[in-house]
Amino acid sequence: MIHRFHTRIAKEYGIVEAVLFFNIAYWVRENEKSSRNFHDGYCWFYNSVREIAETTHDYLTENQIRRALKHLVESDMLYRGIYNKKLYDRTYWYTLTPKARLMLDEIEMELDKK
């Protein structure tokens, strides 16, 4: 599997954060295209930390993923919510904040110029 990130995000937030951020951004956009996982005016991505570690980021520990997600939420790059149908399911859902979307737009415009 190929993972990518932009150095601007990595410099500001960390490499693990940048890798996770771009993966979440990809899935949020895919969900938007297929009109899935909309709640409270946002389109969301969800997976447990364990699922993220086992399926897409097997080179990261669960603690690295947990810390990076917490950092991205605290840095206003991701919103975190719980929208599970089963009340006992405490899997977090993540979406991009307006700040994150603006940064992604700037990065994409920068890449389009090259």
Model-derived segments and their meaning:
Residues 1-51, 98-105:
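Short recognition helix of helix-turn-helix/winged-helix DNA-binding domains
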Residues 31-92:
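Winged helix-turn-helix DNA-binding recognition segment
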Residues 70, 98-114:
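Charged low-complexity intrinsically disordered patches
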Residues 14, 57-61, 112:
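Residue-level recognition of short, structured coil/turn motifs
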